[in-house]
Regions:
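A short, structured active-site edge motif that brings together acidic residues
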Residues: 77-83
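Short, surface-exposed amphipathic charged segments that create phosphate/polyanion-binding patches used
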Residues: 90-99, 206-209, 256
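Active-site histidine-anchored catalytic micro-motif
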Residues: 11-72, 87-89, 108-109, 121-241
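A charged helix-plus-loop insertion that forms the helical arch/lid used to bind
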Residues: 92-116
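Fungal secretory targeting signals
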Residues: 1-10
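Ligand-binding beta-strand-loop-alpha-helix segment within the catalytic cores
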Residues: 73-75, 102
């Protein structure tokens, strides 16, 4: 009997789906990890990166939002503060030649007025913390200081080979560092799922309004183009790209009210602070990680990232068929459309009935 039980537990662990979720966390940024937990994915840790704001601020947002819902049993690991090469000055010099991006993320000019009003920090000192931005409450805890996000990723794929999804909905800096640190890292992961990687949207950027142009800009890849190329050409068993599809489904006021009808700390924060101007970007990628079958239209293509600083497409992706692909790139799964109803229902259930640390005891 003991042998049977032990064997059953070992089999259960071998079938377990783990994830490390890397993002530029913010007040309402908790939905992706709630979606993952609701889908029985065990989150080994959250990682912070520099994309919409500096990673130090994002890491504390991760800690704070976990505390809000009794999820502090999930550790947070600080990622790289700086992209591999890019800096605010270098970014703005590129813009002088190729045009201004509608959303500049952490590289937007420093604005003390906006910070005083609750905006997350941009440019300036990357390690400064703007407490006014923590509408979810300033955290009591802090990120883990035992190791870095990239080191943690490497350690976990060795501990659970073939079982750990690397989810990235911000810059790919930490993933690229892990790829370069350990030649086995990517191949030992289960897969890589990212939010970002838009294709064929230049005309919409040019003819739409500024908000529509914002929806089509690719700051997650463009803030660290070199890291994006390293990560998206690495030998992960599978890479799923939630690019254009992430713009498919938008929240509505009615949906926020429906979520709030089941009161808990997360449904309340979602109701108060989720911006209706933006689609379910990160949530779409998280749902695809949990249940790839929500994709109803996808294709396999070879993908590269433009790392030429002199190019107007610096940081954007380019896709190829196999016969025309250059050497050194790989095939990815590019999702065009998801089942919107299933996505909405998954988000709603995760918010209305969120998991907590008590569920893992």
């Amino acid at each position: 009997m003991l042998t049977f039980v032990t064997g059953s537990l070992a089999l259960e662990r071998a079938d377990k789906h783990y994830a490390i979720m890397d993002n530029d966390w913010y007040t309402a940024g908790f939905v992706p990890y709630l979606v993952a937990l609701d889908g029985d994915v065990e989150i080994l840790g959250l990682a912070s990166d520099t994309a919409n704001t500096w990673q130090a601020q994002g890491a504390l947002h991760a800690v704070a939002t976990l505390e809000a819902g009794n999820l502090s049993c999930i550790p947070v690991y600080s990622g790289a503060t700086w992209p591999l090469i890019n800096t605010p000055n270098r970014f703005h010099a590129w813009e002088m030649i190729h045009g201004v991006l509608p959303w500049q993320g952490a590289f937007a000019p420093e604005n003390k007025t906006l910070e005083a009003e609750g905006g997350d920090p941009k440019s300036g000192d990357p390690n400064r913390i703007v407490k006014e931005a923590f509408k979810e409450g300033f955290p009591k805890g802090r990120p883990e200081n035992s190791t870095s996000a990239a080191n943690f990723m490497v350690e976990m794929v060795h501990k659970y080979p073939g079982q750990v999804t690397i989810y990235s909905a911000g810059a790919l800096t930490n993933v690229a560092l892990a790829v370069r640190m350990d030649p086995q890292f990517a191949s030992l992961a289960k897969d890589l799922v990212i939010m970002g990687g838009y294709v064929d949207l230049n005309m919409l950027q040019a003819t739409g309004n500024i908000m529509q142009a914002d929806h089509q800009s690719d700051i997650n890849l463009m803030i660290d183009p070199e890291a994006s190329k390293i990560a998206l050409t690495a030998d992960f068993p599978n890479i799923t790209i939630a690019g254009n599809v992430a713009n498919q489904v938008f929240p509505t006021k009615e949906f926020l009210e429906e979520v709030r009808s089941v009161p808990n700390p997360y449904s309340e924060l979602f109701y108060k602070y989720y911006d209706l101007s933006f689609p379910f970007w990160d949530e779409t990628a998280a749902a695809l990680m949990v249940d790839p079958s929500i994709s109803v239209n996808q294709t396999s293509v070879y993908l590269d990232v433009d790392t030429s600083y002199g190019s107007p497409n610096y940081g954007n992706i380019h896709v190829y068929q196999k016969a025309l692909a250059p050497p050194g790139i790989r095939e990815v799964n590019y999702v065009f459309e998801v089942d919107a109803e299933r996505l909405i229902n998954r988000i709603k259930h995760a918010l209305q009935y969120p998991k907590s640390c008590a569920d893992f005891e």
